[in-house]
Amino acid sequence: MASSTISLQSISMTTLNNLSYSKQFHRSSLLGFSKSFQNFGISSNGPGSSSPTSFTPKKKLTPTRALSQNLGNTENPRPSKVQELSVYEINDLDRHSPKILKNAFSFRFGLGDLVPFTNKLYTGDLKKRVGITAGLCVVIEHVPEKNGDRFEATYSFYFGDYGHLSVQGPYLTYEDSFLAITGGAGIFEGAYGQVKLQQLVYPTKLFYTFYLKGLANDLPLELIGTPVPPSKDVEPAPEAKALKPSGVVSNFTN
């Protein structure tokens, strides 16, 4: 009997200890959950509380509010001021340009023919040589009813120390066309917009008017003199043709 009594007492003590530990663990768990709920905006007064659980939702982000926040976080937006720049492209037939690489089985231009080229570049007032053009034209089609051709052109305009501009788009030999300004370097970093191409004498004389956006500063006066009205008879100033110091920009591209 004594042994049975001791065993029952041991079992009772063990059970009480287990119950006490479970109760403490339960309270710790509730405290942990309570802290987690608070992190999500949920409050709880614990078990047995008569007050209901409350939830504080975040404000709904409407499209208008999201757009407003995005606009507010935008820094240094691209400048939208339009600056005009005019240049003449002239081929004196002394640069072994253009080259015609035939792919189409025709004596005329046909789809896939390639025309790499490089020509001389002058300011719009024809007083200074600034550099060269360099790029590639891909023949898209011959247009017999207009006695001309359509090219897809990708090329750059080099301005010596000032940097360069790159363009891409249609080059039509029978009418004016517009190409996209795809970028630039030097003072032309960040440039975008479009350029108007006017064919004066095919393929040796062209006039361009750039409508530049995205530039950080105004164009230098040296590049934006009053342009000579485009015509097939225009010629660069003698100083520019002879590459005299007064007729070229700094480190002009040749």
Swiss-Prot record:
Enzyme Commission numbers on file: 5.3.99.6
Family, as annotated: Belongs to the allene oxide cyclase family.
Keyword Cytoplasm: no
Location of the region described as Disordered in the Swiss-Prot/TrEMBL record: 44-79
Transit peptide region: 1-78
Name of the protein described by the UniProt record: Allene oxide cyclase 1, chloroplastic
Biased composition (Low complexity): 44-56
Top class in the EC scheme: isomerase
Subcellular location as annotated: Plastid, Chloroplast
GO cellular component annotations of the record: chloroplast; chloroplast envelope; chloroplast thylakoid membrane; cytosol
Main localization of the protein described in the UniProt heading: plastid
Reaction catalysed by this enzyme: (9Z,13S,15Z)-12,13-epoxyoctadeca-9,11,15-trienoate = (9S,13S,15Z)-12-oxophyto-10,15-dienoate
Domain of life, per lineage: Eukaryota
Molecular-function GO terms, alphabetical: allene-oxide cyclase activity
InterPro entries reported in the protein's UniProt record: Allene_ox_cyc (IPR009410), Allene_oxi_cyc_Dirigent (IPR044859), Allene_oxi_cyc_sf (IPR034871)
Further information: The four allene oxide cyclase proteins (AOC1, AOC2, AOC3 and AOC4) are encoded by duplicated genes. They are very similar, and most experiments involving antibodies do not discriminate between the different members.
Native source species: Arabidopsis thaliana
Record carries keyword Transit peptide: yes
Induction details: By dehydration stress. High local and systemic induction by wounding.
Pfam families in the cross-refs: Allene_ox_cyc
Gene (UniProt): AOC1
BP GO terms, sorted: jasmonic acid biosynthetic process
Function: Involved in the production of 12-oxo-phytodienoic acid (OPDA), a precursor of jasmonic acid.
Tissues where the protein occurs: Highly expressed in fully developed leaves.
Keyword terms: Chloroplast, Isomerase, Plastid, Stress response, Transit peptide
Biased composition (Polar residues): 65-77
